[in-house]
């Protein structure tokens, strides 16, 4: 050993002899050749699990319709800017790309999220390998992640969530590579990733801060004691700067959005709910990530990466204090699954293959049975039967069907948000096409909420509907300054929501209501308002001004 020295390759630290033997046919060091072959073997092995995840997504992503949030995010793609009221701009750029390349079908809109999900699995396998795990560790970590309810539920919808998770996992992998190699290029890659991550979801900033503090209070603090750490931080801020400028120019609408979110949703989340849900969201894979967390915190073998466990604790406590939603923390679990795979690999190092296979089955197969609860792998009727069984026999999982109103429902809020949009848009088209050709140019469409407006924008294209007006969410940013129309097609969640408008119009006609039994929009009505009076336009301008000031 004394005659050897450490030499770092691009991918992992390897102990090379000072004068390695050579293969005399190729002239290359034998140890380097063995390492490259081994690296390729592990890469190919990880690709198996990437393929499993992608296949699972492709089999299920078109079973239900668009989610309410997906319709908003796709609409943002037609209104590109450096910021929006509820999200940073990255999802809008992806929407523009997706619509341009793949089209506007449900299946097409979820292709990029499926790719992101596959990359998360790839990086989880690579992190496991970097920690020192072999094939059993990789298999346990990747399968646990693929079938964990948290990641099955969040890994297929066109939302910032899955891309946020991707940047979290990529940041962790790059930090581990930097720790293993001290190659500063990885540090600058971290800076780029954090910058893009903050353009995806603002929670990236909190995770990055948690990791930095975790490093500073660990024995690895020397990793940040150089000018390149500051350079990486400045690079992140430079990438994120356009959104900061946009927020400043628009009076920081994200602050208003967060206040509204806290008052309408987050205030219902208790600390106890958050803790319990973190223990339940990964289902049977709980022992894997818990063991990984403990190994990162206390294991001598993983002492270099103790800062990851500290970072998890810090971001957990922050979200607990802020009444964060359970999925805000999902991006931190792949690193714990990777560490858990390594931990069980060490624990079962001398065990036979049947025992290792049994461990994988124990921590993954039960989650396979839970998939219909979080991912549309079955038709809706069979899925509802699963929910009924779940609520009767597994009451500790009843939070799955608890909506933001804190009431229990027949299905999850996410599933309910995927139904009724085609029906609603068809009613709007019925009202619009029922007007004479001479009246259509003088017709406006108004929707109560962003889901309705997004559906009319995306699904209404086939009916040649005019642009929809909505003062909810980011739609208010491009809403017209006034309504100059003789006819208004109004989409209201409830009739009571528009009763105050009736004295401001000459007459109105009810076109119909959404009847889908499982839709969150069930009961949403479509109305034709005829000859609005000036008072309606004045009310609209007042509401628009108030909305933009929030």
Model-identified regions with their sequence ranges:
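Extracytoplasmic catalytic/substrate-binding loops of multi-pass membrane glycan-assembly enzymes
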Residues: 59-73, 83-95, 103-107, 251
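Transmembrane-helix signature of polytopic, membrane-embedded enzymes
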Residues: 39, 43-44, 124-147, 165-166
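Short helix- or helix-capping micro-motifs
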Residues: 50, 141-146, 194, 198
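Transmembrane-helix motifs of polytopic, lipid-linked glycan transferases
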Residues: 47, 111-132, 170, 174
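Transmembrane-lumen/periplasm boundary regions of multi-pass, lipid-linked membrane glycan transferases
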Residues: 196, 205-305, 319, 372-377, ...
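Short acidic/glycine- and proline-prone juxtamembrane loop motifs at membrane-interface regions
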Residues: 150-164
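Membrane-interface transmembrane helices that cradle and orient dolichyl/undecaprenyl
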Residues: 129-132, 171-187, 294-302
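Membrane-interface alpha helices of multi-pass inner-membrane proteins
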Residues: 79, 174, 186-201, 236, ...
